[in-house]
Regions:
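A shared catalytic/ligand-binding motif for oxyanion handling
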Residues: 1-161
Length: 161
């Protein structure tokens, strides 16, 4: 069979994506004040915040054998406050209100949680095509992916390959 030709896409670069690696031990909500400062510095109302937050947002759906006392309750509350302040939506939970899928697992796979996720601006949620938690490879974390349709014109000099 003949292979399809590769397709080159042009992307508009928009300063809107804080990459988050939340503290992996202790309950440190003040860390997310830094995230807020970064978002304020960007000065854009289109935000895609991505990363390993090291917090489960929904204890019932996003964790398996992961106790709430261990899972940083003050930090979780702070993330919800940030979501309200910047009108951010948890893409996975928005698309899959009851689905259980975990992006992190302990070595023995007994403890699992959805610690890696995307938060996007409410005004961008209609542009979300999909999100996935993929496989893990030589890691305790899985790949998480976000698929967006870009509604902006892609034919000006500010685009990059």
């Amino acid at each position: 069979p003949r292979r399809p030709e590769p397709v080159l896409y042009r992307f508009t670069v928009i300063p809107c994506t804080p990459n988050v690696y939340g503290p992996s031990s202790g309950d440190h909500p003040e860390f997310f004040d830094t995230v807020c400062t970064h978002i304020d510095h960007i000065g854009n109302d289109i935000i895609v915040a991505a990363g390993d937050w090291n917090v489960v947002l929904n204890m019932k759906l996003d964790s398996r054998n992961y106790q709430s006392t261990v899972n940083r309750p003050r930090t979780r509350k702070k993330i919800f406050d940030v979501m309200v302040q910047y009108e951010l939506i948890d893409v996975f939970r928005n698309m899959y209100p009851t689905k259980r899928k975990y992006s992190w697992r302990k070595f023995n796979s007994i403890k699992q949680g959805r610690l890696d996720f995307f938060l996007v601006s409410e005004n961008l949620i209609s542009e979300v095509v999909g999100t996935e938690v993929g496989p893990s490879y030589r890691s305790d974390h899985s790949i998480v992916q976000l698929f967006l349709k870009i509604p902006y014109p892609l034919n000006d000099e500010n685009n990059v390959l």
